[in-house]
Amino acid sequence: WNRFNARSGGTLVEKCCHFFDLMRLALQSEPVRIMASAGQSVNHLDERYGGAAPDIWDNGYVIVDFASGARAMLELCMFAEGSRYQEEVCATGPSGKIEALVPGPGRFWPEHLGAAPVPRLIVSPRDPKGPVEMDIPVDPTLLEAGDHNGSTFYQHRLFAQAIRQGGAPAVSLNDGAMAVRMGLAAQQSGLTGQAVTL
């Protein structure tokens, strides 16, 4: 199902909506314009399903302008599995830069390379200069509960808590809908080469 845009909404929806949601959460602002450049360069080129070639993109860039004046960018590469870190999330502002380096699931890390990477946080203040790097180890019990470096555990716990106690979920229906809307706008921009206003 996830080899075709018609079934998945496209890579920028299916794989990237979570990152668009994180952008909104971190910035506490709504997107107003999205621009993307993306394509299919490596993955699934020789596959056929029912005679049809997969058309999902495996790489791209997305720029999101927010109502607050903040700007965010997503870089996607679906064929860089050899990297030490699967995700690199950065925020830059007038006080400096903070980077979170997140490895992929440890079960995919080749044994011959030694222990799987540990998540890292790098805080680089503007003044005084001097990056501070620290490992952020994740409890192995949380890693066993699901992927995403333990966050699956917290997602399930918060969701179960909302059901059992009748509270609001941590992520609303509107949050999910906006993340998908951002992904669809990015897909449209990538297809047309034009910015999409939300």
Regions found by a protein language model. Name each.
Residues 13-16, 170-176:
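Conserved loop-to-helix N-cap of the C-terminal "lid" that shapes the substrate pocket in Rossmann-like
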Residues 177-188:
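C-terminal hydrophobic helical "lid"/dimerization subdomain
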Residues 188-198:
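C-terminal capping/lid region of NAD(P)-dependent oxidoreductase domains
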Residues 1-55, 60-62, 193:
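Predominantly a Rossmann-like dinucleotide-binding segment in NAD(P)-dependent oxidoreductases
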Residues 75-83:
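Glycine-rich phosphate/pyrophosphate-binding beta-alpha loops
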Residues 19-20, 156-157, 183:
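A general structural signal for well-ordered alpha-helical segments in protein cores
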Residues 43-53, 61, 65-66, 89-174, ...:
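C-terminal glycine/acidic-rich active-site capping loop/insertion
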